[in-house]
A protein has these predicted regions:
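N-terminal Rossmann-like NAD(P)+-binding domain of SDR-like oxidoreductases, especially those catalyzing
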Residues: 1-153, 312, 322
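Residues that form or immediately flank small-molecule/cofactor binding pockets and catalytic motifs
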Residues: 31, 97, 115, 155, ...
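Residues in well-ordered alpha-helical elements
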Residues: 34-35, 47, 59, 66, ...
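C-terminal substrate-binding subdomain of Rossmann-fold SDR/epimerase-dehydratase oxidoreductases
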Residues: 3-4, 175-322
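NAD(P)-dependent short-chain dehydrogenase/reductase
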Residues: 104-109, 113, 121, 127-210, ...
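Generic anion/oxyanion-binding catalytic loop in active/binding sites
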Residues: 26, 38, 50, 57, ...
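Short acidic donor-binding/metal-coordinating loop in glycosyltransferase active sites
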Residues: 65, 97, 153, 159, ...
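Residue-level signature of the cytosolic catalytic core of signaling kinases
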Residues: 7, 20, 29, 33, ...
Length: 322
């Protein structure tokens, strides 16, 4: 496995905690640097490419829209160009976001054929990333021995996320400091899921379409409808699971626009690939709290991480070939 990314953006960072630079072929490269990207592709000759690199935060995209578009749009152009010029690649998966859709605040989930038009610079840049991939597919990839898919995942949670302005990392930060968790949009609904759900799907899809191009396409990946909860509900679950007097309160939010209601219809992935979510949102919170407490109690976090991955993969065996 070869990974291309920037240096970890947080201290601490899961990449450093697990010493992944000692376990995989890790290249610290900006995906906007096409020449450096081409050199890695020339050397490695990859067969399966999964594109997850991004500026991933809505609030940061308001602060720095040019950088966001540069990374998320031109970065995708560069990845597509590397894929186009390397015949070794047989399977390509571009990971975007559930926020690519034109949000109409519907009470039902968006389907893969609904209109794309993200509102904020982050969401819109990811809509653009989809259009770039579609154009490259129509113009170039369709003439190659290459399967191309796009995946739109809901909000991910899990141990090891230390990013700012994300609900569960904020919950952990406030709680370990014995402070009340401040929630800016408690009534907003999001398709929260454990990070292992979409990541496993990307790997599974990359493998399946490598052997069967007919499976290539666009897929939503999110929780079952019963697990689409409000931010207030998921914070409440966190507090109930963490215990130790964990509590939260709503705070006034005067920041830039964020969607209030967002759900995904994942029927296509369930039907075409026999996929289904493994862990409920309650399970996801329990795993996240377990990981976080283990980390702050100075336990062997690599063992904890591997244990959770293996528990998940054992359950995944029911529908996959992993």
């Amino acid at each position: 496995v070869t990974g291309i990314a920037l240096k970890p953006a947080t201290i601490p960072a899961l990449f450093d905690i697990l010493k992944l630079d000692e376990k995989i072929d890790s290249r610290i490269i900006d995906i906007r640097d096409l020449d450096s990207m081409m050199k890695v592709f020339d050397e490695v000759q990859p067969e399966i490419v999964i594109h997850m690199a991004a500026q991933p935060l809505v609030i940061d995209s308001y602060k720095n829209p040019v950088y966001t578009y540069d990374v998320n749009v031109m970065g995708t152009v560069n990845i597509c160009e590397c894929v186009r010029t390397h015949s070794s690649v047989k399977s390509f998966v571009n990971v975007t976001t559930d926020k690519v859709y034109k949000n109409k605040e519907w009470v039902y989930g968006y389907r893969e054929n609904d209109r794309l038009n993200g509102y904020d610079p982050y969401s819109n840049s990811k809509s653009c990333s989809e259009l770039v991939t579609d154009s490259y597919t129509n113009s170039f990839f369709n003439t190659l021995d290459l399967a191309v898919s796009r995946c739109r995942a809901g909000n991910v949670i899990g141990g090891g996320d230390f990013s700012g302005n994300r609900i569960i990392p904020d919950c952990v930060k406030y709680t370990i400091n014995n402070e009340s968790i401040q929630v800016r949009n408690p009534n907003s609904t999001r398709p929260y899921q454990h990070v292992l759900e979409p990541v496993t799907f990307y790997l599974y899809l990359g493998m399946k379409q490598y052997n069967n191009k007919d499976l290539a396409g666009t897929y939503n990946i999110g929780p079952n409808e019963s697990d689409c909860v409000t931010t207030g509900q998921i914070v409440g679950l966190f507090c109930d699971t963490w215990k130790e007097d964990a509590n939260w309160s709503a705070t006034d939010y005067n920041g830039p626009h964020e969607a209030n209601f967002l759900k995904l219809d994942c029927s296509k992935a369930k039907s075409s690939l026999n996929w289904h979510p493994i862990w409920s949102v309650k399970d996801a919170i329990e795993k996240t709290v377990d990981w976080s407490k283990s980390y702050y109690n100075n336990e062997n976090i690599e063992e904890v991480t591997n244990k959770q991955i293996n528990e998940y993969l054992k359950e995944v065996e029911s529908w996959s070939q992993f």
